[in-house]
A protein has these predicted regions:
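Solenoid-like repeat scaffolds
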Residues: 8-11, 42-51, 81-89, 115-124, ...
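Long, ordered, amphipathic alpha-helical scaffolds
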Residues: 398-483
Length: 483
């Protein structure tokens, strides 16, 4: 018996909904083969009307995820582009689309995706991890795609872009765009961008950059900027007591101002709440940073045991089911600083059987930390292996070449690396920041072989000449950034 047309439609929708739920159940059971067997025929059907519902859009997302993990990245990207055009597409699908483009070196497509997200999908754009955005911008810079980079930076410096990982606009993008606008002969536009800088490290970077320094007349002193930021963050803490973000960033500013005990007190004011999964709306993304800032504050006071404990707690928060990559490296670096290189190497063994890979930058930090530990122990053969890796991947973190040479007491290599960075317009500011003078820390750090080599290298005539040619260093009335 044939059903009347009026009944066929609801029945078909009911059957489709049941199929979508089967796809969802298969994904929850980690059965991607079943997800693809059930979902691909629907997703690849010419008639996309079945995908218009929330369940349909969810099915597309799950198919894309399974295509990606199964290695069918080309098809995953095609389906992600189609799926993100659906009214009910999720922010997660937009993120996967961008990630596929990033990993596939599809730079123009990635910029197009950023553009589309900026036109009505602001929450998706804000949820893109800053490290992904940074990787895209580095790819564009390294491939000399300045027009595409400028397009991306214009979006990333708009008032509508407020990345979830930062409190307020991200100054690094303003700096990069100001450099491009200056190079393009638009100093007034660059000056306007620089006038909006609020973070002390960004202001310091602009002052050290010969291209931007003439445009920084009248900019606030870095310490004044830090005090202004602290006021802003304290206001945000008061207005948004259910958020960790402003509290963490206020603590970082207090530490920059040489007030680490105040930073600790502020962080500890919510210590009895951070284990409550409902206490803070941004707990999932910010708890790791809360522990990181607590560790850095204890480190500023030379309280090794408390700093190490905080780093371990931060690492345990996890990252894709594993110990947090950066927190474990930070812990190893702390152990090296306080004369515990054997413990540092033991800490780093967690990466020996990684079922995941770090970012290119993260891997450089891993090899640098391991190399410095070997140097402290006098294990020159093992150090040489780490040096070889770092030199072979120099473009991923040029400063790591300098750092491992300083750890190893190699004056010639350290000087050569510094001179090379100072001559490179894209590396110059980072080198000058590292070489500049800062306010004295509240507690003197323990002496290290790294520090001894550094003092010798910066007194060399060739290094002094390179510093002068790069525009010179400054003294800043705050503590060293990210110390």
């Amino acid at each position: 018996m044939c059903l009347p047309a009026s009944a066929a439609g609801p029945l078909r929708e009911k059957q489709q909904s049941a199929k979508f739920r089967q796809i969802d159940d298969a994904y929850d059971a980690d059965d991607c083969a079943k997800v693809l067997r059930l979902g691909q025929p629907i997703v690849h059907r010419a008639d996309k009307r079945a995908l218009g519902s929330k369940l349909g859009a969810r099915a597309v997302e799950l198919v894309v995820q399974c295509e990606r993990v199964s290695g069918a990245t080309g098809q995953a990207h095609v389906d992600a582009v189609m799926g993100s055009s659906l009214k009910n597409s999720s922010d997660a699908l937009w993120r996967v689309r961008f990630l596929l483009e990033l990993q596939g070196k599809m730079d123009e497509a990635a910029v197009a995706t950023l553009t589309e997200m900026s036109q009505g999908r602001g929450s998706a754009l804000n949820s893109i991890p800053l490290r992904w955005v940074g990787e895209l911008l580095r790819n564009l810079r390294d491939n000399h795609q300045d027009a595409l980079r400028e397009r991306a930076l214009i979006l990333l410096t708009s008032d509508q872009y407020l990345p979830d990982e930062a409190y307020g606009p991200f100054d690094g993008f303003r700096l990069d765009l100001a450099r491009l606008r200056t190079a393009g002969g638009h100093p007034d536009e660059a000056r306007s961008l620089l006038a909006d800088l609020v973070s002390p490290d960004a202001i310091a970077s602009a002052r050290l950059d010969p291209r931007l320094r003439p445009l920084m007349v009248g900019a606030p002193d870095e310490r004044v900027a830090a005090e202004q930021q602290l006021t802003q963050f304290r206001r945000a803490i008061r207005d948004h007591p259910d958020q960790l973000s402003a509290l963490v960033q206020a603590s970082a500013v207090l530490r920059m101002l040489g007030r680490p005990q105040e930073a600790i007190d502020l962080l500890q004011s919510v210590a009895d709440q951070v284990d409550d999964s409902t206490a803070f709306v941004d707990r999932d993304s910010k708890l790791n940073w809360w522990w990181d800032e607590l560790a850095r504050s204890y480190k500023s006071l030379n309280q090794y045991e408390k700093a190490a404990s905080a780093y371990r707690s931060g690492a345990a928060v996890g990252e894709n089911g594993a110990l947090n990559f950066s927190q474990m490296i930070n812990l190893a670096d702390l152990q090296i600083l306080f004369g515990r290189p054997k413990e540092a190497l033991q800490t780093l063994t967690v990466f020996d059987d990684l079922n995941r890979s770090g970012s290119p930058y993260g891997l450089m930090m891993l090899h640098s930390s391991r190399g410095c530990a070997f140097a402290s122990l006098g294990e020159r053969e093992q150090l040489a292996k780490e040096v070889d890796y770092i030199r072979a991947h120099e473009k991923d973190a040029p400063a790591a070449v300098t750092d491992i040479a300083l750890c190893g007491g190699d004056d010639e290599a350290a000087a050569a690396s510094l001179i090379k960075r100072l001559a490179d317009p894209d590396q110059r500011v980072g080198a000058l920041l590292a070489l500049s003078d800062y306010a004295d820390p509240p507690v003197k750090r323990p002496p290290t072989a790294y520090g001894s080599t550094y003092l010798r290298v910066v007194e060399r005539a060739d290094v002094k000449a390179a510093i002068a040619a790069a525009g010179g260093t400054r003294r800043f009335a705050v503590l060293e950034f990210d110390s």
